[in-house]
Amino acid sequence: MDLNQMTTKTQEAIMSAQSLAVSHHHQEVDTVHLLFTLLEEQDGLAVRIFQKMNVDIEALKQGVENLIKKKPSVTGSGAEAGKLYITGALQQLLVRAGKEAEKLQDDYISVEHVLLAFTEEKGDISQLFTRFHITKDNLLQSLMTVRGNQRVTSQNPEATYEALEKYGRDLVAEVKAGKIDPVIGRDSEIRRVIRILSRKTKNNPVLIGEPGVGKTAIVEGLAQRIVKKDVPEGLKDRTIFALDMSALVAGAKFRGEFEERLQAVLNEIKKSEGRILLFIDELHTIVGAGKTEGAMDAGNMLKPMLARGELHCIGATTLDEYRKYIEKDPALERRFQQVLAEEPTVEDTISILRGLKERFEIYHGVNIHDRAIVAASVLSDRYISDRFLPDKAIDLVDEACATIRTEIDSMPTELDEVTRRIMQLEIEEAALGKEKDFGSQERLKTLQRELSDLKEVASSMRAKWEKEKEDIHKVRDLREHLERLRRELEEAEGNYDLNRAAELRHGKIPAIEKELKEAEEMGANNKQENRLLREEVSEEEIADIVSRWTGIPVAKLVEGEREKLLRLEQILSERVIGQEEAVSLVSDAVLRARAGIKDPNRPIGSFIFLGPTGVGKTELAKTLAQSLFDSEEQMIRIDMSEYMEKHAVSRLIGAPPGYVGYEEGGQLTEAVRRKPYSVILLDEIEKAHPEVFNILLQMLDDGRITDSQGRTVDFKNTVIIMTSNIGSAHLLDGLEEDGSIKEESRELVMGQLRGHFRPEFLNRVDEIILFKPLTTNEIKGIVDKIVKELQGRLADRHITVKLTEAAKEFVVEAGFDPMYGARPLKRYVQRQVETKLARELIAGTITDNSHVVVDVENNELVVHVK
């Protein structure tokens, strides 16, 4: 018995049989041990052959195990350590297996030869095989269906048996089983694929398109047409086999094993004489797949068959990967014919979603409104810019359905609140039960009354919830049943089983449809009452998912947000004092955007704020971010003084290829990709190099920038604010009596601005807003604001701070300089008021819950504690 004449799997089985004998304390390895180890391997050849013969594997295994238990076991001092004998029966079996291999003209003894040898066994195994109707003839018959007319010429032949079933899936069979969603549209692409497949040579289409546009769906559409026989004569009765490259490569430990597996797949396809169409999704994976030193990759193995037309192959890959992998190998590229899969339009996407609607409704057990489908297509196209239709729209609908489904399966909020309240009262009841005083007993009686009422409410709500859930599940089950019957009808019509088709079409299907209609009508009538569960997916759910994905508020305005937006101007004016024009223009731009009437291809608003230092330019941007997003952190702030050199522009959009930092992306583009709805503040723009502004032209006009990686970054949902001190000298000198800016000063400032920036840049900005220098009255308002902020910092200690009118006048007089704006005032309050308060706090003069008044005495600020 030469182990080298056996295949790897046979050797492994003999080794396992030895281990099994040792574990049972047997002195010898017998045929039953070997048979048991062959049946133990779930994916093994023996199991596959017996399954083809409809043998109950578990029962057979149990029978063999009983035979093993009958064998004598030796333990203790009588057992010879480390010695194990092979019985004569096992040796005879392996000799017979060798003869079977010779009969089949095989070079190695494989598992199937051992099985054939088992059929000639006498004794217990023979009786067991008879009980399960296992004979040599039907074993040979099953073996031929698994192995075909292949010979065993290597030590691992099992890998090449049933190669197609093992390394991929049959799309046509999946369509027949109803596992593939319907494909809507894409007729021109499917027709082009059919035309290429009908050619004599180079009949290999490759579908190229962006990720998510439906390349795989086109092939699934072709499979559906083949099932419906809606294809030319040459493609009828064909099958599409989707190759799984990862399954081919996985577990190929030895050199040549991968090539052996692939060759087995190709041979089976070749033998089918064009009946099998090979589909390789992610076609670029064949370039370099299985390539090791001195070995061939999958691409090179496919080339000869592709060129001769022996292999009908459909590939699918993205544009980038086609360019990166396939185009670099011209010999491979010329064997494929390109079919470009374009992104469908919004209208086409709506049609696709309408076709998939029923599938989603059945799977999730919900109802999808048509408005939700339209909203998913329109909103995904408008707001999710880095992905492609129809994939992103389908994802939106799927997630919205899943949201409603989880709500149906979870306890309703109203019932949850009542249940928690009951639990809380029960804990209180247990605590009060231990108390003996009159007050506690009275409270206990009141509590018990409330508890019994709540329990009654909870039980009725729970019953209502269970009933609603039951109704929803009933509708879902009926829909699933109807779907199954329709699939059976298609199958019956395809097989010309007219009796079954008539029974389904005129009997079962109408009955289920009627029952479903009644159940849905009952559900619709119940909706008039106060329902705990909702099963509708409307456009609100879709808008909510879009907002969750992108951070852009597209959901309908709730009452609180409505009021907030209408009061936006007032909110901004409270923090930015004395700049009514600027506040009004900015809040109007935001209102237009939230009302949905802004130009969808431009940013929400783009502004240049001009004015002297310290008048509220940067403060307005911060306030806007705070008002819109409840956080100043949502503001993307870029100090343009860092962009004084010409080459610094690459920091905004990312370094070009070949430079350090290319992979990292740009400071501006990456920030906006992560937060598409934000306020962008470009501070001190006149400090930047003029070349930097060329990059901003597209951002201001079309609301987009292409970064160094070639990705388009969407700025359509941003507010762009640029601040500058240009012309501040003219603004300081040119004020009217009422504090407004003189017309000639305005002209001088605009002239200076035009001299510094190019016309094409200024022409793209929505508004150029001049901030006027602050007057004394406005400065008093700013003093109040600074004191209010100080008050906020002391609020947790309940200390109030108040400045008398005289103190305010004194602070304004001493701390305000028109040239420097409000900043020196803040520093003055910090130095003169906050420092004095800090001294008193540390000294202990000011304690918690104190009232502090700041006044002026002898031309100096003093602190009084009350």
Curated annotation (Swiss-Prot):
Residues 394-528 form a coiled coil. Residues 6-71 are annotated as: Repeat 1. The keyword 4Fe-4S does not apply. Residues 344-551 are annotated as: Linker. CDD domains: AAA, RecA-like_ClpB_Hsp104-like. Keywords: ATP-binding, Chaperone, Coiled coil, Cytoplasm, Nucleotide-binding, Repeat, Stress response. It comes from the Bacteria. GO terms for biological process: cellular response to heat; protein refolding. GO terms for molecular function: ATP binding; ATP hydrolysis activity. Residues 86-149 are annotated as: Repeat 2. Residues 774-866 are annotated as: C-terminal. Residues 162-343 are annotated as: NBD1. Residues 3-149 form the Clp R domain. GO terms for cellular component: cytoplasm. ATP 2 binds at G611, P612, T613, G614, V615, G616, K617, T618. ATP 1 binds at G209, E210, P211, G212, V213, G214, K215, T216. It is found in: Cytoplasm. SUPFAM superfamilies: Double Clp-N motif, P-loop containing nucleoside triphosphate hydrolases. Residues 561-773 are annotated as: NBD2. Part of a stress-induced multi-chaperone system, it is involved in the recovery of the cell from heat-induced damage, in cooperation with DnaK, DnaJ and GrpE. Acts before DnaK, in the processing of protein aggregates. Protein binding stimulates the ATPase activity; ATP hydrolysis unfolds the denatured protein aggregates, which probably helps expose new hydrophobic binding sites on the surface of ClpB-bound aggregates, contributing to the solubilization and refolding of denatured protein aggregates by DnaK. Belongs to the ClpA/ClpB family. Homohexamer. The oligomerization is ATP-dependent. The Clp repeat (R) domain probably functions as a substrate-discriminating domain, recruiting aggregated proteins to the ClpB hexamer and/or stabilizing bound proteins. The NBD2 domain is responsible for oligomerization, whereas the NBD1 domain stabilizes the hexamer probably in an ATP-dependent manner. The movement of the coiled-coil domain is essential for ClpB ability to rescue proteins from an aggregated state, probably by pulling apart large aggregated proteins, which are bound between the coiled-coils motifs of adjacent ClpB subunits in the functional hexamer. This is Chaperone protein ClpB.
